[in-house]
Amino acid sequence: MSASAAPASAIEPTRRAASTGQSADDRPTSRDQSENGDATRAVSGFNGNRRVPPPVNEPVRSYAPGSPERAALKERLHSMADERADIPLIIGGDEVHTGELVDVVMPHNHQHVLGQWHKSGAENVDQAIAAARRAARDWSNWAWEDRAAVFLKAAELLATTWRSTLNAATMLGQSKTAFQAEIDAACELIDFWRFNPHYAQSLYDEQPLSDRTMWNQLDYRPLEGFVYAVTPFNFTSIAGNLPTAPALMGNTVIWKPASSAMLSAYYIMKLLEEAGLPPGVINFVPGDAAMISNKLLAHRDLAGVHFTGSTAVFNSMWKTIGASMSTYKSYPRIVGETGGKDFIVAHASADPAALSVAIARGGFEYQGQKCSAVSRVYVPESIWPEVRDRTVAIMKDIRMGDVTDFRNFMGAVIDSRAFTKIGEYLEHGRKNASVVSGGVARGEEGYFIEPTLVETKDPAYRLLCEEIFGPVVTAHVYPDEKWTDILKVVDETSPYALTGAVFSRDRQAIRDAALLLRNAAGNFYVNDKPTGAVVGQQPFGGARGSGTNDKAGSKLNLVRWISPRAVKETFSPPTDYRYPFMAEE
């Protein structure tokens, strides 16, 4: 790809390119070639307890007219749109060009090709496994502070010279607006890379009690084998966090990025290389999901899976792993964040203005393609007319179109498959419920679907139960006096339990919702939309059909990527096998 594809500071000499005919198995990394090849050589020569810089959430830039960040982003959008990125595999630090190419297109202008990515073959997956194994010999023995320094450096690069590049790639390749890209590709990913070292430090600080005769210690070892990271299209920050969180804890990773978010994923990989990530620690392997998963999930060195995607795919992977348990060296750690059917339930005391804004923002930002997006709402009869009218007025005011036009609130849905699926739900709504506003899909230029509000009298209606993953919100209106009854309906309607919110100005009603919906959402909001979790503030994840609830952006997630070893050293070992009770009286 051309040098203009990344900021000047982000360009480094390209490592040796490799074709599919070259075997990665026998090619040593630069660290394998270092003096003596001793596995302990990377332990830092440093005396002192080091502390990572205290993490602070990255401020969200406004991109207001006249601001320097707006000008820089506009310039990068223009230059990136004119480039045709050539996106290779990156295995053991080598760029692999397979020649089997797939186009990267703009969802909001699907005739515009941004570049092409090389599709991996089975032999490339084998090469990635070998590269991960080689890198683990060294990386697992780095002092944790040195590993943390790589990701702290990556955070600083993203906060400065790489910010416009990653935001532009997310906007053009995933059809996010400038604001949605900023809070995702910039701020949240920066936060992951700053907060995770802080959480790792806290974890490593946890040591057992000892007395004067012994020293008890916990050795927080990485897992034995490789971690398989499978990342989604809808959040660049998740694409960056899923491979790097296990890597921070000393693991090596094979990363399969989403085919519909390849441009931003590639730039993440190049940023990490500039930050000093050693070859083979993370291996970038785009390609057919089924082929890659079949290879990796059958390998004895599979140590973990870090996944974000559909519930059906995660269930299939879990089933495959369960059927292969006799294959593995250790029990694989399986961490997943999957589907959602996220709700807002309103009490009669709710503020209609705040509720309407929450429905519009929570349901239609990023075209409803957030895992946490509002998809179903329950509103009492007494306030529904005002809530409906306010929400429709907002919807009529929303602009939708090319995300490089900063006046637009919405872009396009991600691809033709999503466009078709959402269109089928719209048709179902027209035939079986009442479409209050929206409901139009236009796919000639981009995959555009209007923000849509559907009303139904049936609390078990299909659009209230199934994940749509688009800008479609379905409302059920209930009698005011049925408050506790509707809470039970909310809890039992969906198999998912990711996010949800209650709107009320009555504290008892809030207490009712918090209790009866305790297991209905892993992230629960009071008088706020159920989207926009911030690292360090609202650790994210849900249970039931929404995943393993291992809370990305917290210490809880990092615990899954270590295998502790308890070490006891005795200073005065016994010299007599007999115990005192054995003595004669």
Where are these regions (language model features)?
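Amphipathic alpha-helical packing elements
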Residues: V52-M80
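Glycine-rich loop-to-alpha-helix module at the N-terminal edge of alpha/beta enzyme cores
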Residues: T98-G99, V104-V105, H110-Y204, L487, ...
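Residue-level signal for inorganic ion chemistry
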Residues: Q111, A132, R147, G250, ...
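Conserved C-terminal structural/oligomerization subdomain of aldehyde/semialdehyde dehydrogenase
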Residues: S2-V52, E58, S62, H108-W117, ...
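Short, basic/aromatic recognition patches
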Residues: K74-G99
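Hydrophobic face of alpha-helices
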Residues: D126-I129, A148-A155, R163, N167, ...
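ALDH superfamily catalytic-core signature
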Residues: L271-G276, A298-R300, G304, T311-P459, ...
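Rossmann-like NAD(P) dinucleotide-binding subdomain of oxidoreductase/dehydrogenase enzymes
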Residues: M171, I190, A200-S356, G545, ...
